[in-house]
Amino acid sequence: MSGIWKLKVPGKIKHFLWKVCSDCLPTKVNLMKREILANPTCHLCGRIAEDTKHALWDCEAVKAVWCMDFSWVNWVEAAHGSFLDLVDRLVSKPRVAELFATTAWSIWTHRNKSRLLEKTIPLGSIGEAAKTFLQQFRSCRDEPSSSRGKLIR
């Protein structure tokens, strides 16, 4: 889990991933445990209790997002582990982990907006939006090549 803090993603995404790995996201199951909600059913698929892994990975509504850019993931193996196991496997590959974290954060953001009936992008566009967001973040962090090595007097 310590690899999370080394990822080159915005702080809000690192914090989100830490919450995911600590199982303290306010999923419906976690809210039910705190006696805030009575019904833990996922509002996206309407069939299964919404825990962290379901909300971000197992829900039929979000699987298509992962299939687009993460088709190489062993789905059978991923189905048996926790979301933390999945994160641990990916953090060893920083560029992949950064896209994974940004995509998961984008799915969670979509879930929250749709639950509150706010405007969202279609689920099928989340993968591309996550890539664009990450590219923009990286370009903002990079120093302009023209200013390197020049001394202004």
Regions found by a protein language model. Give the residues of each.
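Primary recognition of RNase H-like, Mg2+-dependent phosphodiesterase/nuclease domains
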Residues: 1-153
